Regions:
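Residue-level detector of short, conserved catalytic/binding motifs and their immediate flanks
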Residues: 6, 56-58, 153
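A conserved short beta-strand
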Residues: 3-19
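The feature captures the conserved acid-bearing segment of alpha/beta-hydrolase catalytic domains
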Residues: 16-127
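Second-shell loop/turn segments in exported
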Residues: 8, 64-68, 141-145
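Catalytic active-site module of serine/aspartate enzymes centered on a nucleophile-bearing elbow/loop
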Residues: 133-166
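Stable alpha-helical elements in mature extracytoplasmic
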Residues: 1-4, 40, 73-77, 148-155
């Protein structure tokens, strides 16, 4: 529903329509599936033929020690959604923030349409940063890891719902 959503966040996911069965889902997760950007984009376009509006911007978080969803899936999502946004796969901005690798991809108008966070030392979990500072939050648990980066906070910044506090 690209007409309903301006942006979204993916936590250790696979590209849209990377699988159409449970078995294919496991293959996509554990082994990864590589396709040309055009093929990935076609899977999105075929979902709503004739749609001419803007597609949602994405922010993607993936642990660099994830053994459940292969790291290459993040790159495949980048291929899919940079193609959807008619931009290239070369990051326009990269850096290390709070020890994690960050990349941003801009469209022809300079808007950030895809962002990636490779979370150092994290497996298949949600990145939290317990604490009381403005950029901290969340609790550690079975599916949440203290990564020194609160993914919900950075998602809200990406979606322009809040301004960066520090």
């Amino acid at each position: 529903y690209p007409e309903l959503f301006a942006a979204g966040a993916i936590m250790a996911g696979t590209p849209f329509r990377s699988a159409s069965s449970l078995q294919e889902g496991f293959i996509a997760m554990f082994k990864g599936i590589s396709k040309p950007a055009e093929e990935w984009a076609k899977l999105v376009h075929d979902q709503q033929p004739g749609y001419t509006g803007r597609y949602p911007a994405l922010i993607i978080f993936h642990g660099d020690e994830d053994r459940t969803v292969k790291q290459s899936n993040m790159h495949e999502i980048v291929k899919q959604f940079t193609e959807i946004h008619a931009t290239d796969q070369e990051a326009d901005h990269t850096g290390i923030i709070k020890r994690h690798r960050y990349s941003a991809f801009h469209d022809a108008y300079g808007r950030t349409v895809v962002e990636t966070w490779q979370i150092k030392g994290m497996g298949h979990k949600y990145a939290v940063d317990p604490g009381n500072e403005s950029d901290q939050g969340g609790k550690t648990g079975t599916f949440a890891s203290s990564a020194g980066l609160y993914s919900a906070y950075y998602s809200l910044i990406s979606w322009k719902l809040i301004e960066q506090m520090r």
